[in-house]
């Protein structure tokens, strides 16, 4: 067994990888500028974690794994190179695991985390002891990653950033949607779509490529008519055997909102008999039509792998979400505060719609922390439509991640642009200021959405704390 040192171990992706390495019997250490719940969980498993970075931390390691967020010189990576310690990436490990065992890869611009979690939960509920590697904590699964039975599939949330998903040769893959993102890696929408086409071409059995028919970006991925399609309602596709229009392979119909969440009927199309058959009624505890699609994909994958579909559906009913995915932080004085990872305009729009579905008749107030200068600029014209349904939108300073720029200037420019298109928008400022300004804007009965992929969840925690303070002083 080997000793892996992970630089940037507090991140969702790297902390999940650490759990898989531990499950395989390896020794893991790590460092990061901050600690969090993820590092606390790893420390409880015996992982030595340093806060900060120092060249001495890599001594004794057999390999150093570094997050993609690191650019340029880094003291630990420089020391590792001087000591002859190999530097690995996520892609290196994914390539190795993909060769060791079957991988079910879940790709797409939006919905990867939830669909990955639902797929793993459906498989396990249906009798398949799969492993999983997900970029968020999933309470229903007991964490973000487990190795599981090495002869069973490993469900991987296949991130397209840095083209890392191209390291996989999946036994099965789901593509939820394809919509241009990560302009720092993919300069044009054509570049982005080409990467997904390359990913889809690497699926070993084309009949195990599941594509969402509701998304126009996936259409080009079915190059030979063998892919399986899923979607909502009575959409049709061309059956490659009969050369006639036929129902989708997996269809969600009669979607209804319930007090607990939503329900729908799942149907499948038998390409051998040309018959459309009822599979089961599915109950979900999470809101949003996008989650109906996610659940349909997960159940289709479980069925194709041979899981018990009825048991898989029952397992999905226990899914209450993942960390930072429509995560209810609390309710104080009639105000519900929800944190979500949404940072692309399409995700922001879907999350607002989910809040309106879950909390009908209540005002939805939204805080958005734009994520990276390149994404904010590249998707500029999408923001008004994404935010239009909110009662009030507060725009925080841009989270730069690995990029350089003026976070205040771009945020205030975005506010002016939204206002020009009729959106009730305000400038929120930095984290602490944004929380204060949100508390001043909200009223009893409001639903507050805190959206972003950076440290925006701190705003949610601060809003809860300030509301509790106001309530105590009343």
UniProtKB/Swiss-Prot annotation:
Query: What is an example of a GO molecular function annotated in this UniProt entry?
Result: UDP-N-acetylmuramate-L-alanine ligase activity
Keyword terms of this UniProt record: ATP-binding, Cell cycle, Cell division, Cell shape, Cell wall biogenesis/degradation, Cytoplasm, Ligase, Nucleotide-binding, Peptidoglycan synthesis
Give the enzyme's main class according to its UniProt record, as a single word. ligase
Chief location category: cytoplasm
Q: Name one GO biological process term.
A: cell division
Which pathway does this polypeptide act in? Cell wall biogenesis; peptidoglycan biosynthesis
Residues that coordinate or bind ATP: 108-114
- This protein's record includes keyword Protease: no
Note the SUPFAM superfamilies from the entry. Answer: MurCD N-terminal domain (SSF51984), MurD-like peptide ligases, catalytic domain (SSF53623), MurD-like peptide ligases, peptide-binding domain (SSF53244)
Give the catalysed reaction(s), semicolon-separated.
Answer: UDP-N-acetyl-alpha-D-muramate + L-alanine + ATP = UDP-N-acetyl-alpha-D-muramoyl-L-alanine + ADP + phosphate + H(+)
Q: Which InterPro entries match?
A: Mur-like_cat_sf (IPR036565), Mur_ligase_C (IPR004101), Mur_ligase_C_dom_sf (IPR036615), Mur_ligase_cen (IPR013221), Mur_ligase_N (IPR000713), MurCDEF_pg_biosynth (IPR050061), UDP-N-AcMur_Ala_ligase_MurC (IPR005758)
Q: Where in the cell is it found?
A: Cytoplasm
Gene Ontology, cellular component aspect: cytoplasm
What EC number(s) would the UniProt record show? Answer: 6.3.2.8
Which Pfam families did the record assign?
Answer: Mur_ligase, Mur_ligase_C, Mur_ligase_M
Family of this protein? Belongs to the MurCDEF family.
| PANTHER family xrefs | UDP-N-ACETYLMURAMATE--L-ALANINE LIGASE, UDP-N-ACETYLMURAMATE--L-ALANINE LIGASE-RELATED
Q: What does this protein do?
A: Cell wall formation.
Its name, as the record gives it, is UDP-N-acetylmuramate--L-alanine ligase
Please tell me the species this chain comes from: Chloroflexus aggregans (strain MD-66 / DSM 9485)
């Amino acid at each position: 067994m080997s000793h892996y040192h992970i630089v940037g171990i507090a991140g969702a992706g790297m902390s999940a990888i650490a759990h898989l390495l531990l499950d395989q019997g390896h020794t893991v250490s790590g460092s990061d500028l901050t600690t969090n719940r993820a590092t606390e969980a790893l420390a409880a498993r015996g992982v030595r974690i340093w806060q900060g970075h120092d060249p001495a931390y890599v001594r004794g390691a057999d390999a150093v794994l570094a997050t993609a967020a690191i650019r340029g010189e880094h003291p630990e990576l420089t020391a590792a190179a001087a000591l002859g310690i190999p530097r690995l990436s996520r892609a290196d490990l994914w390539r190795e695991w993909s060769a060791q065992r079957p991988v079910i890869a879940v790709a797409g611009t939006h919905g990867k985390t939830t669909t990955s979690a639902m797929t793993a939960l459906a498989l396990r509920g249906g009798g398949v002891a799969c492993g999983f590697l997900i970029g968020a904590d999933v309470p229903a699964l007991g964490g973000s990653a487990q190795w599981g039975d090495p002869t069973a599939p490993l469900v991987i949330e296949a991130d397209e950033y840095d083209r890392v998903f191209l390291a996989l040769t999946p036994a099965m893959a789901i593509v939820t949607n394809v919509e241009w993102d990560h302009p720092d890696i993919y300069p044009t929408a054509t570049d982005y779509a080409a990467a997904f086409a390359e990913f889809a071409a690497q699926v070993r059995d084309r009949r195990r490529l599941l594509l969402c028919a509701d998304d126009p970006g996936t259409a080009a991925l079915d190059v030979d008519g063998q892919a399986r399609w899923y979607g909502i309602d009575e959409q049709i596709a061309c059956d490659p055997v009969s050369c006639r229009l036929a129902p989708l392979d997996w269809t969600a119909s009669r979607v209804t909102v319930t007090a607990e969440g939503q329900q729908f009927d799942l149907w499948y199309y038998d390409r051998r008999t040309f018959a459309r058959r009822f599979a089961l009624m599915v109950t979900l505890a999470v809101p949003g039509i996008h989650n109906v699609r996610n659940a349909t994909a997960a159940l289709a994958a479980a069925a194709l792998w041979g899981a018990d579909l009825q048991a898989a559906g029952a397992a999905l009913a226990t899914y209450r979400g993942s960390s930072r995915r429509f995560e209810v932080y609390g309710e104080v004085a009639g105000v519900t505060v929800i944190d979500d990872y949404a940072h692309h305009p399409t995700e922001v729009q879907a999350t607002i719609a989910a809040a309106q579905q879950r909390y009908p008749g209540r005002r939805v107030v939204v805080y958005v922390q734009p994520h990276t200068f390149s994404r904010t600029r590249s998707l500029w014209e999408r923001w008004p439509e994404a935010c239009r349904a909110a009662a009030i939108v507060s725009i925080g300073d841009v989270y730069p991640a690995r990029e350089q720029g003026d976070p205040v200037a771009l945020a205030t420019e975005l506010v002016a642009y939204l206002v020009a298109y009729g959106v009730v928008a305000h400038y929120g400022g930095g984290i602490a200021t944004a929380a204060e300004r949100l508390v001043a804007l909200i009223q009893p009965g409001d639903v507050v959405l805190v959206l972003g992929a950076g440290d925006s969840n701190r705003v949610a925690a601060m809003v809860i704390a300030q509301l509790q303070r106001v309530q105590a002083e009343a």
